A protein has these predicted regions:
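Membrane-proximal helix-loop-helix units in multi-pass membrane proteins
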Residues: 109-160
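Alpha-helical transmembrane segments of multipass membrane proteins
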Residues: 47-55, 72-76, 99-103, 124-127, ...
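Membrane-interface helix caps and helix-loop-helix hairpins in membrane proteins
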Residues: 80-84, 104-112, 189-190
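Structural signature of hydrophobic alpha-helical transmembrane segments
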Residues: 53-69, 88
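Short juxtamembrane and helix-loop transition motifs at transmembrane-helix boundaries
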Residues: 17-32, 45-56, 72-82, 161
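C-terminal membrane-adjacent module
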Residues: 145-243
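Cytoplasmic-side transmembrane-helix entry/capping segments in multi-pass membrane proteins
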Residues: 85-96, 112-119
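Short, Lys/Arg-rich, polar N-terminal cytosolic tail immediately upstream
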Residues: 1-35, 232-233
Length: 243
């Protein structure tokens, strides 16, 4: 009869340690990819400044310039701290685009339109990529985990997790868009601005949390860079032996 030995305490401890390491690595990778809580705050605060100043002053130019100036200061602070450049510049460019669009059009609501269109496009991208078998979350996080596209063919459990995460991001961002666009069309700028600020951090936190849940339960990533380095070392050793 086959033996069904229970795992030893040492084996269970090893598995628990491996699981904890995997969860910690996933958490670090997610914070690196999405800028952490600080990145979420930085994308929300300029919009808060814009709607607050516009509510009081009713001046598009003052509100837009103030929001852009704050975004620039936040970007410079990231550069001084030697943080990732993509987080330093992405927020600045987004706010600058919205500020210019609002001032040129003369409609304060257009300050938020570029970001809303980006959110909607991102939602569609997540959903379409998941349906196509190339989940966008895998394309984003694969290089961070040093697995590149190995999850598509060699690690099906990771592909399932990335697909679930992409669906989560897509549906959450789609729901956010379903709230904001009616306000853009039929509400006033104050309503749109405050609701957009309120919907800035919670949906992203929920999306990141669900992604963490899916990936922490998935198999560990295959480090393709380590594999290539090992293959190169083996090749050098064979050449040295041949000499």
């Amino acid at each position: 009869m086959p033996s069904f030995d229970k795992p030893t305490d040492q084996q269970e401890a090893t598995r628990d340690a491996q699981g904890a390491d995997s969860r910690a690595a996933t958490e670090v990778a997610l914070f690196e990819a999405f800028g952490g809580v600080r990145g979420m705050v930085e994308t929300t605060v300029p919009g808060l400044v814009f709607v607050a100043i516009y509510t009081v002053k009713r001046d598009i130019h003052i509100a837009a310039i103030a929001a852009l100036g704050l975004s620039l200061l936040l970007g410079i602070a990231r550069l001084v701290r030697k943080d990732t450049l993509k987080h330093a510049f992405s927020g600045v460019f987004g706010v600058a685009f919205g500020a210019v669009f609002a001032m040129m059009s003369g409609d304060a609501k257009n300050f938020y339109l570029p970001g809303m269109l980006y959110t909607l496009g991102l939602a569609v991208g997540y959903i379409v990529s998941a349906l196509a078998g190339y989940p966008l979350m895998g394309l984003i996080l694969g290089p961070v985990f040093k697995e590149n596209l190995s999850w598509r063919t060699r690690n099906p459990g990771r592909k399932v997790a990335y697909t679930k995460a992409s669906w989560a991001w897509g549906l959450i961002l789609l729901a956010k868009s379903a709230v904001l666009f009616p306000l853009y069309w039929w509400g006033d700028v104050t309503q749109l601005g405050w609701v957009k600020v309120a919907l800035g951090i919670p949906p992203m936190l929920l999306s990141v949390y669900l992604t963490w849940i899916f990936l922490s339960k998935a198999p560990p990533p295959i480090d393709v860079f380590a594999e290539m380095e090992a293959a190169e070392r083996a090749e050098r050793e064979r050449e040295a032996t041949a000499r």
